[in-house]
């Protein structure tokens, strides 16, 4: 720094001044120098104080200059950094800064990946919903078909029962009408005075005979009952129906305390059974509910159906354990 160079020059100058009288002095001049040494020492002390003061002032000036330069540099650096930050902010706002573009590119890439994944997931969800809808439609159709078959069997059995009763009533009406006509004819003959039967002599019966003490209506009722029994069991023309009905009722099925007894075996809720119907393939199902006159079960496809105990008794359906 300039201060140190000046100090070096002044120190060298003082050394030269101190060494100069030693080089030029002689033995004869030593006495004169001793006499003048006192005055020179006073002058040198005054010069040292002035130099120190002058140097101190120079140092203070130099320090103030350095502080001023440092402050200027600091302000300049602050302004430069502020301008750089403003420029970077403008680049970010304009979308041109690399610090902004690189994370933005990563975000856009992640957005594209997530959008693609969301699209695939949406397609899978739509396909799943469609399959579930088709499955429910199929189950509803199968349930409807099973209910239609059960309804058809029920109506058919009821109609067959009604036909049987009508046949019995028809036979009984025929018998009753015949007997009633006979009774009317006999009464007319009794009232007719010119009837040839009255001229006949009473028939003499030999041996044991039966005397009927009943009224004609009582005899007619008894005869009707006998003819009904003969129509249901005796005559040859009724035998095919009887054999068919015997075949239909050859199975034993009843419901007791929430369980089903069928052909000597017990069935309960939650058991898996095999349902067999004529002219159809057997299917497996799980019993869900057992009522007094019907049994509900669930098929493998989720559809629910019911069997009437009367259908099991008639042999239209048969079940067994799996």
Curated annotation (Swiss-Prot):
Localization per Swiss-Prot or TrEMBL: Nucleus
Membrane spanning stretches: none
Keywords in alphabetical order: Coiled coil, Nucleus, Repressor, Transcription, Transcription regulation
Gene3D superfamilies per UniProt: 1.20.5.1500
Gene Ontology annotations for the cellular component aspect, listed alphabetically: nucleoplasm
Record has Chloroplast as a keyword: no
Region Disordered, residue ranges: 1-56
UniProt feature, compositional bias: Acidic residues: 17-51
Basic and acidic residues bias: start-end ranges: 1-16
Coiled coil: 50-82, 147-178
Primary location: nucleus
Family the UniProt entry places it in: Belongs to the BRMS1 family.
Record's function text: Involved in the histone deacetylase (HDAC1)-dependent transcriptional repression activity.
Name recorded for this polypeptide: Breast cancer metastasis-suppressor 1-like protein
Natural source organism: Xenopus tropicalis (Western clawed frog)
